[in-house]
Amino acid sequence: MTKTPHHLSVRSRVANAAGAAARFTSRALGRGSGGMIGGEVALRISPKFLAELAAPFSSVVVTGTNGKSTTTRMVRSALESAGPVASNINGDNMTSGVITALMQGKNASRAALEVDEMHVPAVAADVHPEVFVYLNLSRDQLDRVGEIGSVEKRLRQGASAHPDAVVVANCDDPLIVSAAADNPSVVWVAAGAGWGGDSAAYPRGGRVARSEDGWHLIPAFEGEELPDLKRRPQPQWWLEDVEL
C-alpha cells in the first residue's frame, strides 16, 4: 500500500487510502494495473486531492500528439540523477493516471508527468508545473481530443496560466509555437522532423508558408493583419544530421 503523505488533509488521507486499496484490488483481480481506478476513487472522495498531493513536487508536464511516453521516460531518466522521480510512464496520462503516479512516488520530490493534451489546463492548475514540454500536434484520434484548433487553445490556456513556468516547445510545429508564444520563458527546440501538416492556417491569423529554412506566415486574404510572431522562432537547441 502507498504510504499516506503527511501534508494531506484528513479527507485527502482517506482518499489516498481508498485509492491505494482500489489499485491493489484491481491488480489482484487481474483487471489491469490500477493506474486509472486508484486516481478516480481518490478524486471522487476528495476533489482537491491532486492539488494537495502535488504540492511538494517539482513537476514537468509533457504533452503532444506523438512522443509523449518516450519523452517522459527521457525526462524521468534525467531527473533521476538527483533522486527518486514520480512518473506515469505506462501511459495513464489523464487526471486519474497523474494522481496514481504521484501516489506511487515514494520518497520522490520531482515528477515527470505525461499528460493528455485536453487535460493539460486542469492538471496544470493543480500540479503547478515548473516546466511544460510541448512536442507537436496533429489530427490523431479526433473523436477523442476534438478539432486540432481546440487542442491548441487548451495547450495555450495551460501554459498561459503559469507564466512562471518554462515552456520547452517544438518551433518546427506552428501550432505548438502558437500555444507557447505568450509565455515569458520559452526554450525553442527543433528536431528537424516535418511537423505541421495540420497547420496550414495559423490559429492567431494568417496562413503557413513553408520554405527550406522553416516556415513563415502570409495573409490568408488581402489586408489581413498578421500576429507579431510571423515566422519560425530561432531554436536554442536543435538536432543536425540525425536520422529520426
Regions found by a protein language model. Give the residues of each.
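Long, charge-rich boundary regions
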Residues: G223-L244
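Gly/Thr-rich phosphate-binding beta-strand-loop-beta motif of the actin/hexokinase/Hsp70
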Residues: G214
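Phosphate-binding loop of NTP-binding sites
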Residues: T2-S211, F221, E225, L229
